[in-house]
């Protein structure tokens, strides 16, 4: 069964012209670009985030001391759950 107007074949039901869809997509791309730019500028101002990635996979801090960060990858399970420190 063919649509009533073959010129509007690629347009979804409910849209009567493609100009609205094109304008909507353009503003979405622009919004995404602004969001990406604000996230990038916000992370560059973060003083807690180290910018030196030369330590490699060893993950050691300068001076040979281990770097401690909050979260599951920093310090191990015993730091997250103090009751586990008592276990042998």
UniProtKB/Swiss-Prot annotation:
Biased composition (Low complexity): 34-44
Keyword entries, A-Z: Early protein
Domain of life: Viruses
Keyword Cytoplasm: no
Record's signal peptide: none
Pfam families: Adeno_E1B_55K_N (PF04623)
Disordered, as annotated region: 23-88
Keyword Kinase in annotation: no
Other observations noted: Residues 1-86 are identical with residues 1-86 of the E1B 55K protein.
The protein, known as: Early E1B 9 kDa protein
């Amino acid at each position: 069964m063919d649509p009533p107007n073959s010129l509007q074949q690629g347009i979804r039901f409910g849209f009567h012209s493609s100009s609205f869809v094109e304008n909507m997509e353009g503003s979405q791309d622009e919004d995404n670009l602004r969001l990406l730019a604000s996230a990038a500028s916000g992370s560059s101002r973060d003083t807690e985030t180290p910018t030196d990635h030369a330590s490699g996979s060893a993950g050691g801090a300068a001076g040979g001391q281990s770097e401690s960060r909050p979260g599951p990858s920093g310090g191990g399970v015993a730091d997250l759950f103090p009751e586990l420190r008592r276990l042998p």
